[in-house]
Every structure is written in structure tokens, then in C-alpha cells.
Regions:
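Sec-dependent N-terminal signal peptides
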Residues: 4-14
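Sec/Tat signal peptide C-region and signal peptidase I cleavage site
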Residues: 14-20
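Extracytoplasmic small-molecule ligand-binding "clamshell" domains
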Residues: 21-84, 89, 93, 174-250
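Periplasmic-binding protein-like
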Residues: 28, 102-137, 175, 185-186, ...
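Extended ligand-binding regions for polar small-molecule ligands
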Residues: 28-30, 50-51, 56, 117-163, ...
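Flexible hinge/capping segments at coil-to-helix
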Residues: 32-41, 263, 274-279
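Disordered inhibitory propeptide/activation segment of secreted metzincin zinc metalloprotease zymogens
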Residues: 151-181
Length: 279
């Protein structure tokens, strides 16, 4: 496993009362905080129940400390909440957690890795744009079969570009159809916006390849994670990125009714729980 910041895996994440502890996560398109807390997605993590109760809540407790989830509309807001103690821990995909750790040189964060069943990401469209979704799906199929999605993942997520992704040039085609797609920058380096407000990273590079295959103009529209559903339903954008698709049979917290999705374009099976180090 890749070396984590300061070569430390968390031995004791956080001591809290047995009655409640709060977990920060990015807003989902198809769930309220209450619904998310009731389902407790952390229960899907392999062996998580005992591990979380002993590591996060402290040993010798009753085991009734079910987490309460709090949604944040952006990664920045979620990090600020962790810094000021509004939440006990935050959860992120492994690649986001590693990005945060690399960009936290003072080593003030601690992490524990949970194994989950695979979670995948897809592009989401309204049902009335199902034909457009189908075209994007065919492009993704081609890019998967020819190895391009794997190549981009190695370069932008696992490679040196993950530290500070550069903006990607997206080819424009005169007179061609324009497809507006929301980019949030809230799950770097997969979905990333640089300090100057320019989208970059894996998603941008992937969209450039899709635009080239389909001969369409990709227009990137900036917005926060919490704005994805509203932007899609209002028609501000034609598609949103990183719709989180859970394994079959599990609750779909991020896929509202009336939304269709492409085949997966990225996936992972590790979740990072991150807390602040005690002073």
C-alpha cells in the first residue's frame, strides 16, 4: 500500500462519548443528512463496525455510538469544519485522502483506512438527455477498451501529476454541439480546480478525450458538490461528473429519480477516515 503522510496509520482516531460522534462527508444528490445517517454507509465497510467503535469511540464502550453524518457542499467547507472541531472525522475516497495528506506538510491529520465493496463513479444526465448519455457511454466504452481511462488514471491520480494537476486543453469544433458539464473541484485530483479557477485533473482530461471522439464541444461549468442536483435539474448543465454508484442492492444515495448514468469511468474500494491530531 502506498506510503501515507508521515508513515503513520492511525492507532487511535478520536475519543468521544458513546452516544454520538459526527462524520463529515460531501453532499449527496439523493439523500438528506438524516437518511444518510439512518443507513450508516460506514456499516458497508469490511469489518468496520467493531473497528470504528474501538478506534473512534474508544475501548470499553457500549457499542451504541452510531455516527451522525453532516453534509458539506464543498471539500473546502468540510476541511474547515474538521479544523474547527465541528465534526470528529471526515470520510473521503482514498485518492482524495492521499491528496489532502500530501498537501498537509505539518502532519496535523491522522488517517484510518476502511475497506469497502467497490464504489464507482459515472456521468449523470436527466432522462430526457438519455440519447446524449448513450453517446457518452459509447465513448467511455471505447476509451476503456483502448486503455485510455487506465492511462489517464495512472497519470493524473497515481502519478506525479496528482500533486498539482495542470489544466488540460479541450479541443473545440466549429459549428459542433456544445455539452455543458459541471466540474466541482471537490474530489481532487480526479475532479480538480486550480487556484486560478481553472478545471484540471483526471475528469478534465477524460472529457477532452470524449469530446474528441464524439466531435462535440465540452464546456466546463464550475460549481460545488452540493450544487450538482440543482444544476442538472435546472438545465444549467447537461451532465454532472462523479455520480457515486453503489453496488447493486445497496441504497443509491447519489442517483436521484429521473437521472440516468453512463458506465463507470472510475472506481475504488478504500475509504479514508481522517481526524485532526490531538495537541
Amino acid at each position: 500500500m502506498r506510503k501515507l503522510l508521515c508513515a503513520v496509520l492511525l492507532v487511535a482516531l478520536f475519543a468521544a462519548s458513546a452516544s454520538a460522534w459526527t462524520v463529515g462527508t460531501l453532499s449527496r444528490m439523493n439523500a438528506t443528512e438524516e437518511e444518510y445517517s439512518d443507513r450508516n454507509p460506514l456499516a458497508y465497510a469490511s469489518g468496520a463496525e467493531g473497528l470504528i467503535q474501538s478506534i473512534v469511540l474508544g475501548d470499553g464502550l457500549s457499542g451504541e455510538g452510531k455516527p451522525s453524518f453532516k453534509f458539506y457542499d464543498s471539500l473546502t467547507m468540510m476541511q474547515m469544519a474538521l479544523n474547527r472541531g465541528e465534526v470528529d472525522v471526515i470520510i473521503t475516497p482514498d485518492f482524495v485522502g492521499e491528496y489532502m495528506l500530501r498537501n498537509n506538510p505539518d502532519c496535523s491529520l491522522r488517517v484510518f483506512v476502511l475497506l469497502k465493496r467497490p464504489i464507482t463513479l459515472a456521468l449523470g444526465f436527466l432522462e430526457e438527455k438519455a440519447e446524449l448519455c448513450k453517446r457518452f457511454n459509447e465513448a467511455l466504452k471505447t476509451l476503456t477498451e483502448n486503455g485510455m481511462t487506465s492511462h489517464l488514471a495512472r497519470y493524473y491520480i497515481a502519478g506525479p501529476e496528482a500533486q498539482n494537476p495542470k489544466p488540460v486543453s479541450i479541443e473545440k469544433f466549429e459549428g459542433a454541439e456544445t455539452v455543458n458539464i459541471l466540474v466541482t473541484g471537490d474530489i481532487p485530483p480526479l475532479d480538480y480546480v486550480d487556484a486560478g479557477g481553472m478545471p484540471a485533473g483526471y475528469n478534465t482530461a477524460l472529457l477532452a478525450e470524449i469530446g474528441r471522439l464524439l466531435h462535440v464541444n465540452i464546456n466546463l461549468v464550475s460549481g460545488e458538490a452540493g450544487a450538482r442536483a440543482a444544476a442538472l435539474k435546472s438545465g444549467r448543465v447537461d451532465a454532472v461528473l462523479w455520480v457515486e454508484v453503489m453496488p447493486e442492492g445497496e441504497a443509491q444515495f447519489d442517483k436521484p429519480e429521473g437521472v440516468v448514468v453512463t458506465m463507470p469511468y472510475y472506481g475504488w474500494n478504500k475509504v479514508f477516515m481522517i481526524s485532526m491530531k490531538k495537541k
